[in-house]
A protein has these predicted regions:
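Noncatalytic, solvent-exposed loop/strand surfaces
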Residues: 1-252
Length: 252
């Protein structure tokens, strides 16, 4: 992740876990902080650090094995939240004043308010506390990262189960299989123009109406394997499949 003049990386593996910042111009290490993530199961993580800018400060949020940890721009730990899976993959993100953390397959989804400090982990039987606005047990996903859009947070499992939660409260508004024939999803969903888009590994893009009720509008087929999340660049959507790179824009 880039923040100011710093390139920040997280290195969580079976031998060591640390976060480090490097000068983006020279490559010189500016600081390094070793991470204590516990000793349960795997020690490897896959989540890119997320720079959370809000009114109180700028934080570097990391999601690692078993725990999420936030740091200030000097590498000092600000807070930590237990409850992640042993090898999380989905990216955290900010939306409408809150931080959203997908703890990975089999774990919870969390919404965190700005200003947290210390250990903000939920006690047993708790679903919220002074810093965690809400949590949803077993709402975490394996590969795709969630997306927030028009008041909803959407999660997609690798097997094609789409769920929508109210962003402010965590209330589940629906949970459904997108299509009986679509059972493999690696890419993260994206949204614009009142619609949600989910691209399957088979190259089918399922277009779903944004809102509290599930409505599949149509399906676009590329007829080739797709495992990379598309990127929105200006008015274009870039989609990479097994052998092609597509640049798609709305017809004028």
């Amino acid at each position: 992740a880039m923040v100011g003049n710093l390139l920040v990386i997280v290195n969580d593996n079976e031998k060591q876990q640390y976060i480090a910042a490097f000068d983006k111009q020279t490559g010189k290490q500016v600081w390094r902080t070793n991470r204590s993530l516990g000793n349960k199961g795997m020690q490897s993580g896959w989540v890119t650090p997320f720079v959370w800018r809000h009114a109180l400060r700028t934080e570097i949020v990391t999601v690692g094995p078993n725990v999420a940890v936030s740091y200030d721009l000097a590498g000092k730990e600000l807070w930590r939240l237990a409850g992640m899976c042993p090898a999380p993959i989905p990216m955290p993100f900010a939306y409408d004043g809150l931080l959203y953390i997908d703890g990975g397959r089999g774990s919870s989804m969390f919404a965190v308010r700005p200003g947290a400090a210390g250990d903000i982990s939920l006690a047993k039987e708790e679903s919220s506390n002074a810093h965690v606005v809400w949590s949803q047990p077993r709402a975490g996903t394996y590969l795709p990262s969630p997306v927030a859009y028009e008041g909803g947070v959407y999660t997609l499992t690798e097997t094609g189960i789409l769920s929508r939660f109210e962003a402010k409260t965590g209330k589940l508004t629906y949970k459904t299989r997108i299509d009986p024939a679509a059972t493999a999803f690696t890419t993260s969903p994206w949204a614009y123009n009142g619609k949600l888009f989910c691209l399957s590994e088979e190259g089918q893009t399922f277009v779903i109406a944004a809102g509290e009720k599930f409505q599949l509008l149509h399906v676009n087929a590329l007829d080739e394997m797709a495992q990379a999340t598309p990127a929105i660049v200006g008015e274009r959507l870039l989609v990479r499949t097994e052998s092609r790179l597509y640049s798609i824009r709305r017809a004028k």
